[in-house]
Structure formats: C-alpha cells, structure tokens
Amino acid sequence: MILFDVGAHHGQNSLDITQHNPNVICYAFEPTPELARLLRIAAEARGMKDRYHVYEHAISDFDGEADFHMVEGDTGSASLNEFADNLSETWPGRTDFAVRGSKKVNVYRLDTWLTIFASEITCIDHLHIDAQGSDLAVLKGLGDKLSMVQSGVVEVPQEDNLRLYKGQHTKQEALDFLEQNGFVNDKITSQVNEDNLYFVRKT
C-alpha cells in the first residue's frame, strides 16, 4: 500500500499507520526543515526508515521555487500562501497566526515529482493532504496521474469567508473538482472553521 502524506507536519497522520501496517510504504512531504528532520528521526527510531521516506519539498500545482512562510507558534500553519487579512474577525484570539519569516523552498507538482523521484509508482492508495491552503492545488498538480489516486482527504474552509489564506480554494471548488474527476466524498469531519473532505474513487 502506497501512502502519500503532503504537509506531514509531525507525522500524526502517517507515522503510526506506517508502523502498525508493515505493507505500507509512506512518502511524507514536509518543507519545514526542523519538522522534516524530526520525521526522519522518528522513522528511524521506529525501525521503518526503509518504508517511511521524507522529502523536504513543498507540493503545489507548479514547479519551481517559492517563498514558504514560517509562523511564530502553530508550525502546522506554515504555508506557501499568505494569511488572509481578516483573521482577527474569523479566527479571534489566534495571535500565533503571525509570520516570523520566509525561506525559499523547492516546489513540485506531484506528476513532476513522481516522474523524477518515484517513476515506479503506479498507484497511490491514499493521499492525505494538509497543505495549508494549497490542498486543491496539490490535487490539480497530479495532472493525468490523478487517475493513480484511489482515496484521500483534503482540508477546506467551512465557508468562503472563513478562508485562512489568501487565494485559498473554497469547499465547493474542492467538492466540484472531486466529482468531476471520478471521486465520491464519503465522509466529512469538522474542526474550527475547517472541514476535512474524505474521498474515494467511484467504482
């Protein structure tokens, strides 16, 4: 089973799954250098260095370099995208949503990345995306290789006016894209201002 974890953060959505399922091979993408380092340490400590591969790349719908915005508190909010201007209204009290600096990172479309780094992969069994405002861009960046994806999850704002980042996709845009490309949204889980859309390929 091939698992992709785009925006792996601390590995909360992939380390345990990979450890407890010896048939899983995970490709984790995390552009924050310190988090990527900790993921590699965790994978080695759990004895799965050969099945848990960490790439310090950002994933989107273009290839090249871009500014990756680092944040003060919540490292899970670091993003290629800038924060929206109305966060004091839509996310009251979240003073940790403050950029502390930016660094240039390598950005890949997933179809390009697969061709360069893992051309042997022909099926992605599960694609977990938490790319902080770029989730739909990650899917679009698969191009024709989107047909390889069997299931996955993307994060979306619950309402258009609750977008955390400038230019972020809407929930409806994500739902429309999934339907147009042969997926069914089979579950939604919610957290503050955001929903996780789980999807599977139509049979």
Identify the residue ranges that each predicted region occupies.
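Phosphate/nucleotide-binding beta-alpha loop and adjacent structural elements of enzyme active sites
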Residues: 1-203
